[in-house]
Amino acid sequence: MKYLIPFFLISTIVFSQDKVDPKDLEVWEPEPKIVEPYKLNGIPSDAIILFDGTDFSKWKSVNSDQEILWSLNKDKSMTVKPGTGAIHTIEEHGSIQLHIEWKTPVVISGDGQYRGNSGIFFQRRYEVQVLDSYENRTYSNGQAGAIYIEHIPLVNASLPPGKWQKYDIIFNAPKYDEKGVKIKNGSFIVFHNGVLIQNGVSILRPTVELDESIPNSLYLQDHG
């Protein structure tokens, strides 16, 4: 007991010296903007809709002079036409939150990386992998939800082929100072079908070697 009592007294003294009026910790400005929360099958009131199922008006083909040859479907989805080229948004982006839904073909062909392979590239540089990873083993840093080659997903939350799957992704772009020197890496938080699979992971290098210091577009891959 003679060792415990002095320790308690010291702790009490330190606490009393650090005591702060709770009101001094209150921050009133800036006040967060009010938005309408999303309802089931809804979207936040300030969201930018990149695809409404009717046209590709906010997208371009990577083959700059070519029209987009992907299919528009009756259920207001789009389908990649292999070999026609990737598409990207007309608008460039910095740090964003993205909700995207996707599914892989019901008819299974191939295995590993040859099953519904695609990717979502943020700023055309950093890839979140899209793949049929349901009972389909491949290298862990290349399965669905991987930050391609760099970060393995925490778990495999994949659904069977033909089922709609969801990614909710928070992308924080890397930061540069006025001299163009990187001062902070970019990062990803990824939820796959509501399950956290990437928890603030740091991006050490781009999937595609492009200038990281400038904004760029969102890119959907045609893997062929």
Identify the residue ranges that each predicted region occupies.
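Bacterial Sec-dependent N-terminal signal peptides
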Residues: 1-17
